[in-house]
Amino acid sequence: MKLAVIGGDGIGPEVTAEALKVLDAVLPGVDKTEYDLGARRYHATGELLPDSVIDELRAHDAILLGAIGDPSVPSGVLERGLLLRLRFELDHHINLRPGRLYPGVSSPLAGNPDIDFVVVREGTEGPYTGTGGAIRVGTPNEVATEVSQNTAFGVRRVVVDAFERARRRRKHLTLVHKTNVLTFAGKLWSRIVAEVGRDYPDVEVAYQHIDAATIFMVTDPGRFDVIVTDNLFGDIITDLSAAVCGGIGLAASGNIDGTRTNPSMFEPVHGSAPDIAGQGIADPTAAIMSVALLLAHLGEDAAATRVDRAVERYLATRGNERPATTEVGERIAAAL
């Protein structure tokens, strides 16, 4: 396995180091190449993501990312020039966000309900394509537009992926959208879900408006198995799912090219947290959980299961203790 590692900014390098510690324990001998991308490189060279680096990344089987973002760089520069460019250049059209409440982890929901679902979010379309503009900027007559692009090709491939995951899980899929208002995109999504669903007669299909889905995620999260949704709604609902599952510090993610033409990228979603960077207190659990997703994607199912179970054992016994960053990695690696 050839793995590209992008530590990135803030706590990114710290949590990534612990994730690699666990990876080495469960699957020794992975060929790792580290890439200096993020705020430091931007300040030193003015570069965000050179074409030559993109070409090098394509030669790897997967990418492990720590975090991107730094207050010394204007908002949007790193996000669009590095993060979004990676996702678009490498065709990461599936954003995978598992939502599971592990034993021993407290949820803000009463009674610590049984929560185990996955959100399959479209990752390269919607309003994140940068299509739009503004005229008469700074005047009382300013007009700004953001265009949400949805293609049959793009929707179909993420819907097929979601149905495949539902078939392997509890055989239930929920489309989340706002079809009563966003009628053009809504009809496209609804039609394709219905068309693809005919090939999966064993999977039950439901629909929820995005506003209703947020209510049920709080009041009845057990109803969800696989959620499929567009880029914007997925961005919102996945952070809510992280909150009900114990916090964003336990949220892992995968940015996946379902065709496997390009390497998929796996990362914790907690951000760079520059306020605690270098203090040795960042929780690397989400980065380690992202390694489990990475292993599963590459067909290393046994190793992925071992990491997931080691994380589960660690969380079940952690209680209110908040160990140092390196200690978390050592404990989970030892549990393997």
UniProtKB/Swiss-Prot annotation:
GO cellular component terms, A-Z: cytoplasm
Name this protein carries in UniProt: 3-isopropylmalate dehydrogenase
PROSITE patterns: IDH_IMDH (PS00470)
Family membership: Belongs to the isocitrate and isopropylmalate dehydrogenases family. LeuB type 2 subfamily.
Superkingdom as given in the UniProt entry: Bacteria
Pfam families the UniProt entry points to: Iso_dh
Residues engaged in binding Mg(2+): 211, 235, 239
UniProt-annotated site: Important for catalysis, residues: 128, 178
